[in-house]
Curated annotation (Swiss-Prot):
Keyword Glycoprotein: yes
Species the sequence originates in: Saccharomyces cerevisiae (strain ATCC 204508 / S288c)
Protein purpose: Probable glucose transporter.
A GO BP annotation: hexose transmembrane transport
Protein name: Hexose transporter HXT10
Membrane topology: Multi-pass membrane protein
Amino acid sequence: MVSSSVSILGTSAKASTSLSRKDEIKLTPETREASLDIPYKPIIAYWTVMGLCLMIAFGGFIFGWDTGTISGFINQTDFKRRFGELQRDGSFQLSDVRTGLIVGIFNIGCALGGLTLGRLGDIYGRKIGLMCVILVYVVGIVIQIASSDKWYQYFIGRIVSGMGVGGVAVLSPTLISEISPKHLRGTCVSFYQLMITLGIFLGYCTNYGTKKYSNSIQWRVPLGLCFAWAIFMVIGMVMVPESPRYLVEKGKYEEARRSLAKSNKVTVTDPGVVFEFDTIVANMELERAVGNASWHELFSNKGAILPRVIMGIVIQSLQQLTGCNYFFYYGTTIFNAVGMQDSFETSIVLGAVNFASTFVALYIVDKFGRRKCLLWGSASMAICFVIFATVGVTRLWPQGKDQPSSQSAGNVMIVFTCFFIFSFAITWAPIAYVIVAETYPLRVKNRAMAIAVGANWMWGFLIGFFTPFITRSIGFSYGYVFMGCLIFSYFYVFFFVCETKGLTLEEVNEMYEERIKPWKSGGWIPSSRRTPQPTSSTPLVIVDSK
């Protein structure tokens, strides 16, 4: 006969299943990178899923194309003749008000689209939602191309196309973040910014190619190409998998497993897929237990939702307040002011720097993490603006503004503009989207992202509309305003933005719910990967058998 006696030494059963804060801090950041669920493979094994993410990210190309082309349109002779105002000397010019409205109103449309059309992703799925918003975008392009000499018709078309792009800006990063492997999520979401920069660059090139014409080819051809981009985007959506989190939400479990397996290049029976699927289901059940999400929930402190919403709004706002669109929207105009003979060529150079630099971002965002990149970017861009503004104010016109500008000073300004764009392209440009795409729990994700990205669009409108007035008033001193915003952004990131590198979306949510201090978040370990360490309060189970 075998008998056993069990004695339990310890005072707290709870302590046996959780770590104390002290024990948690002892764990090393390297442990965080060790995946206990789906093992990492060589990056070449993920080419397929990365290609799919690139297709989804093509929505960013559409936005970039608009940014790159509109900066040239407002300087094209036919565009000014049709939509400008007749001057005393017989020429046509766009007034500051009309220029600001035509450039900036696109962002208002984007904000409206993000807040209203982003909801389609929750109702019909991310893929179908993206197809729907692309259709809205096409309607806006048709209105713009059909405009003949009524600037307000073109204005309305930009609002409608902006609504489509706003929906894309919410749904595209969302879908990428939900289908990409967690250790490549930062890189894959950064594809969206890569496509934006490609669109800006090719938009500049197209403007350069059409400026030699004297009729509506100058601006209607670039607009007509938008139909090709829309068709390519829709075809791409047919090929990509649906979000596994959306599929679980709709009860399509087998499809969700296949989507996870496809993203991680394993079979549906792989233990890692089973573990991640079970985690998604468990989190979904918890969300269902508390009912459907409402707009009011975004302003609740429960689950640290409100601090995350505020953080997303501020990060997206600060991306605009870096001053990036000061160059992208008005680059052609700016370099006319510094004496460049062909400012269209200069814009192409800036677009090329922007596009090439973003490839660096694809590497560093998951190599060095979100916080370090944002901090470095804020500091370097602030330095660039100090030099750009100081040279522009004190050295560009040594004999007065009514005299020729200094070529050497103009060259210095262009060089530091390139340094600024390099710093922006590898840090704030992609990472602002990465942050908002991985910060929110699924039940409020689309609403929270819509508000955050909407803030980006609103600031884009304000900068686009008021820049002509501000530069006319204070000139290149405008750069000091952006420098101040960049200094603020440095301290905001340090005190309020958590490091999410190497975490699943569910683990990111867990970290925020535990209210980890952002400057300590780099060493935080998810509960599923913690190794309990013996303490005086840990129960000790002794089994005697005979």
